[in-house]
């Protein structure tokens, strides 16, 4: 279960991303207690209770939270006040650092197995310890998947791309998470922002999140991607994937290397 002020401040779509990655904690599922943010999100949506059914549903949903005296196997507290946008350097979602940070040194690993895994990841990704993330050039940028291509994600990326162009030599692709999201984005004109910046605007689907339908990036290409996994060859044969949020992917596409979305190129 994810809770606390940082989680409560997140919109529903960001909470979905958080729960999507719960398996990386070796969990079968991830939950966030429903609150007014969730109820407002559900109101009026297709398949949501409506009319006389709404209040009983709301009453039931308000009961779905952990009791104040609940006992958990383990509780972890994370101070998110100084949390920066993150990006991965290796071949697992856990291989993450701040976008303005550097590739870690395997010599600092907590045990031999972790050190070997880090060394293998660095070899595959063709990176070296201490290398600044901001110095890593990319070949492609991908915004898509069930994790980070909902409407709020597309708005975030479009905010970075507006008035800017994708760097020469960078392949940039956007795949909305669903047909409904694609239609909503087009109604807002977001598709024009992506196209004018140099992104391909494609039909919804899994696409190159996991090499679907044989579609992939090129051999050994380095891709910054808003997807949820960065395993070896996940996006193509020997493709090297850096996971990041949509705004980071957009900023990186413009700069041609991993970029901090808090300081957009040309801003």
Curated annotation (Swiss-Prot):
A molecular function annotated in GO for this UniProt entry is: 4 iron, 4 sulfur cluster binding
Q: Name one Pfam family in it.
A: Aconitase
Source domain of life: Bacteria
SUPFAM superfamilies (UniProt xref)? Aconitase iron-sulfur domain
The EC category is lyase
User: EC annotation?
Assistant: 4.2.1.33
Q: In which pathway does it act?
A: Amino-acid biosynthesis; L-leucine biosynthesis; L-leucine from 3-methyl-2-oxobutanoate: step 2/4
The record lists [4Fe-4S] cluster as bound by: 146, 206, 209
Spell out the reaction equation it catalyses: (2R,3S)-3-isopropylmalate = (2S)-2-isopropylmalate
Cofactors (names): [4Fe-4S] cluster
**What does it do?**
Catalyzes the isomerization between 2-isopropylmalate and 3-isopropylmalate, via the formation of 2-isopropylmaleate.
Give the family, as the similarity comment puts it. Belongs to the aconitase/IPM isomerase family. LeuC type 1 subfamily.
Assembly and interactions? Heterodimer of LeuC and LeuD.
Record-given protein name: 3-isopropylmalate dehydratase large subunit
Source species, please? Cupriavidus necator
Source taxonomy lineage?
Bacteria, Pseudomonadati, Pseudomonadota, Betaproteobacteria, Burkholderiales
